[in-house]
């Protein structure tokens, strides 16, 4: 098979949702259909001891939430599928936002009892901004939930996207009978030995079931007043196909997967800093680092840089340019993933995600190119932290482990490090409280370094030019520090302190990052 045909087979997407909507469960079921796991591990592992395949980090297993983005790959129906399972918890939005830069489509999982929730809305905005297609899975039909027409109406009003139901539930909860498949024009049965039946058999199967009568009325209404199906509108991100089902009971998931793969886009190009788009079918390899993960194998204290291949083909042992540093690197130890298990890869193509063993060479956002190509892709989004803590080693004898742990975890980008210019104290900044909990847990569990963390509260962060640096500007209300790139930065106590400083030093330009 030639390079172009290989690239055309790729389907790379992220799963987004509010916490507990069933995102990890549907990921499990997709892997089950892809033949990667023998049984779909349920996320209820907190009690049973069976943990979800995609939640590989110790703290994720304990808490039943995804706090890092897992990458998983399988083949199905002639396609090579790359799933990125993103953190649903809002404190990890930075990791999630970056992950969404590395995919060509998104699957939005919604709890049918709760509808569109806060984190779903936030993540949808990012996806919408990127202009990539969104496929919606209305989950948990095995429980009582809201009326399907209400769910569609809310989806359209809250998210501002048109919807098209690919199937329609017949009852829900204990009265759930199956799905009326509008796209495939058949019935999918929840009970009994037969999985499918023709629409003509509906009246015979369900007799005078009031739920089935309601379904027929709803579908008549949708045919008259609903949106038209349009593959063009789906690919443009203007129309979301909506699938109903139950990930926990594995109902409707296979139909979703098969239909999704028909309409999900091939790998797309990516924009360079000069605005030009790199075509995935360019023969020259290029890619970008969207995530760095330390200790995927705690026994080896390793670090993996996750790379989305944008164009061409990766071959083991190839040399790549790193335009940020002007140096080259050899890609010899490269893996592909099934959550915590991994295998060496000899070649991969545009659309694939590879993991490059990293000894400190790479940073999140780095571009990799070959030959004379030394361009850079557009920068990935970064977030200014809002809450801060001082951090120090509890045991002075563990300073080496403490420094190694901080260095590696900070390079992942979920937490940011600042050093007080005058005292040398370490200060950590994060978007939310959970990031500090995860940091503390991982320092102790992965680096055997207990830490003391002292809250500093919220701070307003502004960078200044090194030319304007004067240590006398620092005070308790505006702490002068340096970030991990040694750039000078002020941590202001509040907006009042910021305005006071700006009035006192009008010639000092204060810069705010995203």
UniProtKB/Swiss-Prot annotation:
GTP binds at residues 17-24, 85-89, 139-142. Its main location: cytoplasm. Keywords: Cytoplasm, GTP-binding, Nucleotide-binding, Protein biosynthesis. It is found in: Cytoplasm. Belongs to the TRAFAC class translation factor GTPase superfamily. Classic translation factor GTPase family. PrfC subfamily. Increases the formation of ribosomal termination complexes and stimulates activities of RF-1 and RF-2. It binds guanine nucleotides and has strong preference for UGA stop codons. It may interact directly with the ribosome. The stimulation of RF-1 and RF-2 is significantly reduced by GTP and GDP, but not by GMP. This is Peptide chain release factor 3. It comes from Streptococcus gordonii (strain Challis / ATCC 35105 / BCRC 15272 / CH1 / DL1 / V288). The gene is prfC.
């Amino acid at each position: 098979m030639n390079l172009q045909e290989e690239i055309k087979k790729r389907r790379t997407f992220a799963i987004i949702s509010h916490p507990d909507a069933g995102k990890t469960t549907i990921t499990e079921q997709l892997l089950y259909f892809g033949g990667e796991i023998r049984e779909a591990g349920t996320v209820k592992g907190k009690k049973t001891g069976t943990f979800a395949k995609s939640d590989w980090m110790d703290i994720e297993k304990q808490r039943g939430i995804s706090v890092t983005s897992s990458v998983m790959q399988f083949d199905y129906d002639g396609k090579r599928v790359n799933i990125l399972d993103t953190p649903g918890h809002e404190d990890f939005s930075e990791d999630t936002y970056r992950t969404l830069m590395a995919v060509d489509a998104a699957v939005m999982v919604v709890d049918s009892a709760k509808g569109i929730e806060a984190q779903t809305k936030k993540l949808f905005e990012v996806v919408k901004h990127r202009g990539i297609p969104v496929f919606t899975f209305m989950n948990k039909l095995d429980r009582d939930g809201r009326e399907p027409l209400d769910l569609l109406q809310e989806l359209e009003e809250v998210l501002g996207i048109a919807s098209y139901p690919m199937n329609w539930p017949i009852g829900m909860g204990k009265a759930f009978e199956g799905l009326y498949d509008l796209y495939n024009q058949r019935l999918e049965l929840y009970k009994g030995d037969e999985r499918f039946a023709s629409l003509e058999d509906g009246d015979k199967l369900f007799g005078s079931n009031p739920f089935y009568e309601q379904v027929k009325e709803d579908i008549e209404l949708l045919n008259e007043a609903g949106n038209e199906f349009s593959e063009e509108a789906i690919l443009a991100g203007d129309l979301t196909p909506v699938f109903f089902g139950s990930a926990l009971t594995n109902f409707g998931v296979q139909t979703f997967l098969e239909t999704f793969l028909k309409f999900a886009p091939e790998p797309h190009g990516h924009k360079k800093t000069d605005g030009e788009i790199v075509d995935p079918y360019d023969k020259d390899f290029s890619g970008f680092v969207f995530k760095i993960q330390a200790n995927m194998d705690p026994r080896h204290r390793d670090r993996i840089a996750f790379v989305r291949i944008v164009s061409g083909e990766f071959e083991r042992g190839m040399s790549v340019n790193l335009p940020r540093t002007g140096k080259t690197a050899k890609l010899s130890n490269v893996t592909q993933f099934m959550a915590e298990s991994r295998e060496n890869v000899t070649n991969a193509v545009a659309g694939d995600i590879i993991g490059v063993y990293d000894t400190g060479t790479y940073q999140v956002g780095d571009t990799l190119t070959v030959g004379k190509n030394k361009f850079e892709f557009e920068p990935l989004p970064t977030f200014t932290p809002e809450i801060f803590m001082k951090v120090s080693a509890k045991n002075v004898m563990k300073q080496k482990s403490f420094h190694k742990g901080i260095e590696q975890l900070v390079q992942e980008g979920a937490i940011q490090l600042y050093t007080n210019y005058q005292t040398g104290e370490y200060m950590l900044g994060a978007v939310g409280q959970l990031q500090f909990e995860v940091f503390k847990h991982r320092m102790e569990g992965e680096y055997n370094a207990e830490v003391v963390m002292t809250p500093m509260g919220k701070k307003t962060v502004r960078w200044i030019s090194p030319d304007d640096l004067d240590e006398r500007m620092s005070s308790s209300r505006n702490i002068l520090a340096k970030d991990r790139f040694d750039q000078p930065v002020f941590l202001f106590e509040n907006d009042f302190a910021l305005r006071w400083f700006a009035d006192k030093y009008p010639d000092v330009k204060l810069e705010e990052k995203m």
